[in-house]
Amino acid sequence: MPGRFREDFIDALRSKIGEKSMGVYGVDYPATTDFPTAMAGIYDAGTHVEQTAANCPQSKLVLGGFSQGAAVMGFVTAAAIPDGAPLDAPRPMPPEVADHVAAVTLFGMPSVAFMHSIGAPPIVIGPLYAEKTIQLCAPGDPVCSSGGNWAAHNGYADDGMVEQAAVFAAGRLG
């Protein structure tokens, strides 16, 4: 999640989890509309989630992303490599990793139509993550809906959805 938006979500979640400890990891990849660059993010995020689950088995993870970051997390939580994905696409995470993920918060996740327009396969959240996932799409956001309002796509830090996602994630953390 970029800049202020990311910090706003972290602050909102931190304010809701009380004395629980919280670490943050920024996925490493070049965020562009060139889909193959997202592969680096899918590899990095999947590897980090798997390693954290293995090395810190009592930890509960909250995954999140905005726009292309939401697409990255969508692919990370997929149950299968989607049709049309590059041959070197990362494999899905082992099913037992899902036990370590408490919540997935996706803002402005690209729609099937948007993914098609950039030559990328559709995003399908895997069944082990579906009930743990909140997908938030601002009205008129052209990335996640059929709208044409780019201000909506760039306004998630100001429209109350960050708070909504933080409440959801905190509730899933228990």
UniProtKB/Swiss-Prot annotation:
Q: Which UniProt keywords apply?
A: Disulfide bond, Hydrolase, Serine esterase
**Is Repressor found in the keyword set?**
no
Short name of one Pfam family: Cutinase
Q: What is its EC number?
A: 3.1.1.-
For this protein, the record's Gene3D superfamilies field holds: alpha/beta hydrolase
Q: Where is this site: Transition state stabilizer?
A: Q68
Active site at S67 (nucleophile), D141, H153 (proton donor/acceptor)
Family of the protein in this entry: Belongs to the cutinase family.
Kindly provide the name given to this protein in its UniProt entry: Probable carboxylesterase Culp5
List the source organism.
Mycobacterium tuberculosis (strain ATCC 25618 / H37Rv)
Lineage here is: Bacteria, Bacillati, Actinomycetota, Actinomycetes, Mycobacteriales
Q: Give me the gene this protein comes from.
A: cut1
